[in-house]
Amino acid sequence: MAMKIRLARGGSKKRPFYRIVAADSRMPRDGRFIEKLGTYNPLLPKDSEERVKMDIEKIQAWLDKGAQPTDRVARMLEAAGVREKTERNNPNKAKPGKKAQERAEEKAAKAAEAAEAADAE
């Protein structure tokens, strides 16, 4: 049984509220879960203590049993100091896309032509 520590959505339309739960990965997102481990209320300010509440002992027990946290829950656990922060690497993020590179090359070529024309005069 593949266990996940994930967010189960509650609340009403436009008013989300999440439970942090340990659930079988094959169950629906908001469906059956094994144990409730905490809550997350994204409507509260980021500095509010009530925004994320977690039972750290229960979460650590599930992690020791082999449960895998989802990406969002993993970030919450990193912020709480339960897990070490994993290094995220996206080397292509800083590079411009194809069209932007083409535009930059065209602009550089025009600038070079203008510089040559200015030198020729």
UniProtKB/Swiss-Prot annotation:
Q: Where is the composition biased (Basic and acidic residues)?
A: 81-90, 99-110
A Gene Ontology molecular function term of the record: structural constituent of ribosome
Q: Which domain of life is it from?
A: Bacteria
Q: Name one GO cellular component term.
A: small ribosomal subunit
- Return any one Pfam family short name: Ribosomal_S16
Q: Where is this region: Disordered?
A: 80-121
GO biological process: any one?
A: translation
Alphabetically ordered keywords of this record? Ribonucleoprotein, Ribosomal protein
Family per similarity comment: Belongs to the bacterial ribosomal protein bS16 family.
Q: What is this protein called?
A: Small ribosomal subunit protein bS16
